[in-house]
Amino acid sequence: MTNTTSPRPMQKEKKKVIEKATLHPSNKHRDRYDFIALIKTCPELEKYVKINTQGDESIDFANPKAVKWLNKALLQTYYSIENWTIPTGYLCPPIPGRADYIHHIAELLGSSNNGRIPVGNKIRCLDIGVGASCIYPIIGNKEYGWSFIGSEIDPKALASAQRIIQENAFLTKDITLRLQENPKDIFHGIMERSEPVDITICNPPFHSSAEESERETLKKLSSLNKKKITTPVLNFGGQNNELWCEGGEVRFVRDMIRQSKQFSTNC
């Protein structure tokens, strides 16, 4: 992620791509972003693409609008998702990282299936906190054909995810969304006792307080801009419930483990 310094000239030849070796081998985003292809799919992205200080095409990752248009272009180009958007201020997830998570989940499922990654909608995933972007169900369904139950405590986020599904008819048969009315419950109120699932996934709130969340945001933005930032701007967005909870991610995961015992026969 680098800062941008000059307008993007029209390039006739595509530069040699550089592989992101840390990403999963099955990840579609291991190479540098192909901005020519992305702009062809999503012309609105073009005004955010610049030449950075290394001479490469990039966007300003500290700019929330640029990040949102990049996500829209990636989802449309690689996952055939039309009209993707999220409400202002909601978490705008980095697509390559979320795709990596799904591919590692696939390997985990394969490890209990004689090394063969299971595909098709008979595989059911429970996504705790599906978010406004519906990102894990989108990638999991497109890459492996899995079906999903997505839970969410925020009605506005749930409505956003539902709109994305309705805009893309192929998702409607495999993704079901449910509102969690009690924020302290993770499984109860979402799952039926006899309802089978193969795996539970989650992107838990990382931070233990709003102050910690703001401090880490300032640190990240300062790194992106190569200078100290004193006013936080959430380039990837995020509501409070998406960014922090009491006890942070460790407490959240412990609660998941404890509450999952009530549904131990659902797997």
Question: Could you describe each region identified by the protein language model?
Answer:
Residues 118-131, 149:
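Conserved class I S-adenosyl-L-methionine
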Residues 63-66, 93-100, 245-253:
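Phosphate/oxyanion-binding active-site loops and adjacent basic polyanion-contact surfaces
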Residues 101-105, 137-140, 256:
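Buried hydrophobic packing segments
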